[in-house]
Structure formats: structure tokens, C-alpha cells
């Protein structure tokens, strides 16, 4: 949908003072260019917003200009729904990939959803049902969602969308801040700066988080935390492996990447799957955290859109195509995905995510992936040291706030020294090995 530049220019000139002069030119242009109904309504709504009046008033002027009786036509359900939106507090915008989003204030906090989503549809149906006490017609909801999408594409500001972890950089000072969405019902996030960290309402953060139904909440981190409980939970071989795991965890809290791929290997009984799940749950608890080997890039794209940390469990080998995808997740790259509701259009998604791979042996790993990996060999847990799953996870949940607090302390130090440590991933990874 493309609105002619002449019409957009006229809309930009609209004000209460200029309306008497502008509206004949604007309405004549609408007739001349033969805009569709949706395009015309979009222009009229933008005009009403600039005038500070209701859409109904501008629509009546338009009908009068056309020689129609503005009171003659019976309003449709979609018109009723549009009128309800005029008094709602919401914002339509788009992501860098041109996906249109809507931000809605609900119960004292703001949520961000794709316009084409079940949540947006449910919000519109609720607005309609609260007033008219009946179910909104499907066509009315679809019409209004199409309006929202057109508005976002043509007039929406561009904002990045983050899942669980987001980064912000001040243009003038170069100051970097990290935001971690706790995923809690109170809609709080952790703000990490070079001076420390604090828990704040998500509405005070300059980044926009998307929450999905798979995410689970993080605990509120404790100050004065410690990493010692983490080392008690993981069957690591010594100080070297602790430094490697700590480096990977801190790297995972860097929103700008890149991210080394962590490989956890070891003989049967070394607790590889559990160790991988512990590391994922530390930063990104989700429903069903362990994933089997992806069959194609599409599986990886979906996982990257809904997770911060990707845990692929019990792999035996990695195909060349999947190996290449893991490389792109590590250092950044595009993933092609067919655009919804089209036959041949594609959208390219940029994705970088921390990845954990577990397995007894992966066979030969291609050099480009090997250059991006950190390998940690876990020790077999002695029979006398084994505990039940319920005991292990009870310990984890008890210590989780302390461990998370310690990681955030370390992340703050990393921000203070960000410019000193920034460099090529290969050099960083190799530097971690003695």
C-alpha cells in the first residue's frame, strides 16, 4: 500500500487553522488518485489526528464533499471499533524488519504485540465486547487490524524488538546499558550500567520487550550474590572450566554479541543435559527448555524469535547446513523466511543468540563452527554424589537469586571495561583457552 506523496504532503499541512483551505485540495486529491476504501480511511484518520477531532467528523466532511448524506449510511461494526480505538491509549510502530507492532497499556503496564497476532485480535474483540455486549464480527476485526498495519507501515516509528535481553547505547556519550526482562507479573526489568544494576518498571526502560507464552519468570536478583553455588551444581573439572563457563554466561548477557557456542560433552552419566538446562534457566527459563536437533533453518528461526538461549540436547552429529546456521547465530547473519500471506515474498531476519550443545560425541565439526565454540568436558558424577531431580532443582531455585545477582555484578564490571574487551570472536575464544 503506497499513499501518493501529494496526499501525504497535504496531510502534513493540516491544522485546525488551515483546514478550511486544505480540505478541498485534500479531498480532490483523494478522488483524483482513486484510493481504496482502506487507504482513504487511513488518510482521513491521520487528518483527524492532526485536527484533534474525531474520525467521524472528518468522515462527515468527506461524505458532504462527495455529495452524500453523512447521516444516511448505517455505521458498520468496523466503524464502531475504530471509534473505540480513538479513546484508547496505544501506539502503532514497526520493527527494523518492517513487522508492524502495537503497544497497549493494560493494568498499569505496557505490552508490545505483533499486529498480526492472537493477542491483538483478543484486545480488539475485548474493546468491542465491553461496549456492545456482543462478539465483534470477524471481518470488522480483520479490517481494523489491516488499518493498524497500514498505519504502522506508512507512519510508524522504527524500534528494535527484544526477547528477554536488550541493549541501549547513548548516541552522544556512547554509554551502554543492558536490560534483562525478568518476565514477572509486575512487569519489571533489570537495568545494568557501568555503575551497577537496579530493578525498574519495564515502562521506564528505553527498549521494547516481547513476551511469549513459552517464557517463565526469573527471580528477583539478590545483591551481594555469589557464583559458588553454581559451581556446586555443575560437574566441572577445575578452575579453567569455571572460567570458560563464566565467560560464556557473561557473553550471553551482552546484547550486542557475538556469542561463542558452548559445547558440553562427556561420558554417559556426566549430567550434560542437566548442566545445559541449569545454564539456560539461569538467564532464560522457558517451557520445555531442551530442544532436539533442528531439522532445518526454519526450526532455528522460530526458536531464536522466542528464546534468548537455545539449548540443543543430546546431539550425535551436526549437518553442514545446521552447522552454518549455528555459525550465523554465533556471530550474526540473516535467515530467510517466507513472508506470511504472500506466495513468493521473503523476509530476512537478523539473529544472534547464545547456543548450548550437549552430546557424548559430535564427530567432526566443521572448522568455521569449531572456531566459534567453547568446549567443556564434564566429569562423570560418582554414584555417592548423585541426588534426585527434585533435590537438585530445589537447590537451584534456592540459589538462583544469588547466582543471578553475582552475574549482574560481573556484567556491570564488563560494561565499565567494554571498550577494552571488544574484539573479534575468534581471538576472544582462543584467548580463553590456556
Model segments located where?
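Structural motif
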Residues: 17-21, 34-39, 72-75, 234-244, ...
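Short coil/turn segments at secondary-structure boundaries
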Residues: 42-45, 94-97, 243-247, 263, ...
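Conserved RecA-like P-loop NTPase ATPase core
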Residues: 43, 112, 249, 273, ...
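N-terminal nucleic-acid engagement/recognition segments and initiation subdomains in replication
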Residues: 1-223, 302, 409, 413-417
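P-loop NTPase catalytic core of nucleic-acid-dependent motor ATPases
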Residues: 106, 194-306, 420, 432
Amino acid at each position: 500500500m503506497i499513499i501518493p506523496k501529494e496526499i501525504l504532503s497535504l496531510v502534513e499541512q493540516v491544522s485546525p487553522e488551515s483546514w478550511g483551505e486544505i480540505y478541498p485540495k485534500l479531498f480532490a486529491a483523494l478522488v483524483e488518485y482513486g484510493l481504496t476504501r482502506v487507504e482513504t480511511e487511513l488518510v482521513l484518520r491521520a487528518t483527524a489526528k492532526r485536527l484533534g477531532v474525531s474520525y467521524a467528523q472528518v468522515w462527515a466532511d468527506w461524505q458532504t464533499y462527495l455529495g452524500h448524506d453523512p447521516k444516511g449510511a448505517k455505521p458498520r461494526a468496523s466503524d464502531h471499533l475504530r471509534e473505540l480505538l480513538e479513546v484508547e491509549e496505544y501506539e502503532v510502530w514497526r520493527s527494523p524488519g518492517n513487522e508492524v507492532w502495537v503497544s497497549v497499556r493494560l493494568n498499569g503496564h505496557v505490552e508490545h504485540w505483533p499486529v498480526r497476532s492472537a493477542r491483538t485480535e483478543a484486545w480488539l474483540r475485548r474493546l468491542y465486547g465491553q461496549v456492545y455486549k456482543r462478539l465483534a464480527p470477524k471481518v470488522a476485526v480483520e479490517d481494523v487490524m489491516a488499518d493498524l498495519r497500514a498505519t504502522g507501515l506508512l507512519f510508524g516509528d522504527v524500534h528494535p524488538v527484544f526477547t528477554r535481553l536488550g541493549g541501549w547505547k547513548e548516541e552522544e556519550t556512547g554509554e551502554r546499558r543492558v536490560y534483562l526482562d525478568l518476565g514477572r507479573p509486575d512487569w519489571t526489568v533489570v537495568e545494568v550500567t557501568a555503575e551497577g544494576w537496579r530493578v525498574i518498571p519495564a515502562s521506564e526502560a528505553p527498549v521494547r520487550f516481547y513476551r511469549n507464552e513459552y517464557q517463565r519468570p526469573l527471580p528477583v536478583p539478590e545483591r551481594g550474590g555469589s557464583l559458588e553455588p553454581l559451581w556446586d551444581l555443575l560437574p566441572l573439572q577445575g578452575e579453567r572450566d569455571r572460567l570458560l563457563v563464566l565467560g560464556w554466561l557473561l557473553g550471553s548477557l551482552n546484547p550486542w554479541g557475538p556469542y561463542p557456542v558452548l559445547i558440553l560433552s562427556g561420558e554417559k552419566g556426566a549430567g550434560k543435559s542437566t548442566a545445559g538446562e541449569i545454564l539456560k534457566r539461569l538467564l532464560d527459563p522457558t517451557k520445555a527448555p531442551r530442544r532436539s536437533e533442528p531439522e532445518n533453518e526454519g526450526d532455528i528461526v522460530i526458536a531464536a524469535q522466542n528464546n534468548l538461549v537455545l539449548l540443543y540436547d543430546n546431539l550425535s552429529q551436526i549437518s553442514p547446513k545446521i552447522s552454518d546456521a549455528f555459525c550465523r547465530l554465533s556471530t550474526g547473519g540473516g535467515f530467510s523466511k517466507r513472508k506470511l500471506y504472500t506466495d513468493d515474498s521473503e523476509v530476512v531476519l537478523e539473529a544472534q543468540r547464545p547456543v548450548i550443545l550437549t552430546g557424548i560425541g559430535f564427530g567432526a565439526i566443521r572448522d568455521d563452527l569449531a572456531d566459534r565454540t567453547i568446549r567443556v568436558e564434564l566429569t562423570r558424577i560418582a554414584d555417592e554424589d548423585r541426588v534426585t531431580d527434585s533435590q537438585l532443582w530445589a537447590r537451584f531455585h534456592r540459589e538462583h537469586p544469588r547466582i543471578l545477582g553475582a552475574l549482574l555484578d560481573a556484567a556491570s564490571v564488563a560494561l565499565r571495561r567494554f571498550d577494552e574487551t571488544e574484539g573479534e570472536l575468534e581471538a576472544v575464544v582462543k584467548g580463553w583457552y590456556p
